[in-house]
Amino acid sequence: MSEVVSLGTAAEKLSDYWSPHVVGSVDDSYVKVAKVKGSLTWHSHELEDELFLVLKGRLRIELEDRAVELKEGDMFVVPKGVRHNPVAEEECHILLFERKSTAHTGDVVIERTRSIAEQLKEPS
């Protein structure tokens, strides 16, 4: 049975930047919220598209040939295989929609990389 999820409240509960939390699933995809600030890392997802929706603040998604600026309410889909680096100058809350197989930082592993198991845990 599905439950109502307040995305704003879910994002506010997060304490760590760049540590997504799964708030729902749709078929073979997860719906995640994250609190972000600063730069994540350049990476790509070879087999999966990744949807970013800004809930609060502003997010820049750097691509190799351009940068995409998103404000509250804007969304952007990074196509599979496209190298990108999300950046937030100030704290920003985002919703991510991605396949369950999508690795957090794609083809690279850094200190901020979170496993799916970590993303499924309730925020502390």
Where are these regions (language model features)?
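Double-stranded beta-helix
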Residues: 3-11, 24, 89-124
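A short glycine-rich, His/Asp/Glu-containing loop-to-beta-strand
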Residues: 7-42, 48
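A cytosolic small-molecule/anion-sensing beta-strand core signal
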Residues: 27, 55-56, 71-72, 90
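Short, charged/polar surface micro-motifs in flexible loops or helix N-caps
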Residues: 28-30, 37-39, 56-60, 67, ...
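Short, conserved beta-strand element in jelly-roll/cupin
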Residues: 35-36, 45-62, 97
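Short beta-strand His + acidic residue motifs that chelate non-heme Fe in jelly-roll/DSBH
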Residues: 43, 61-62, 78, 83-89, ...
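Short glycine-/acidic-enriched loop or helix-start segments at secondary-structure transitions
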Residues: 63-64, 72, 88, 106
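Short acidic-glycine-tyrosine-enriched beta hairpin
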Residues: 64-80
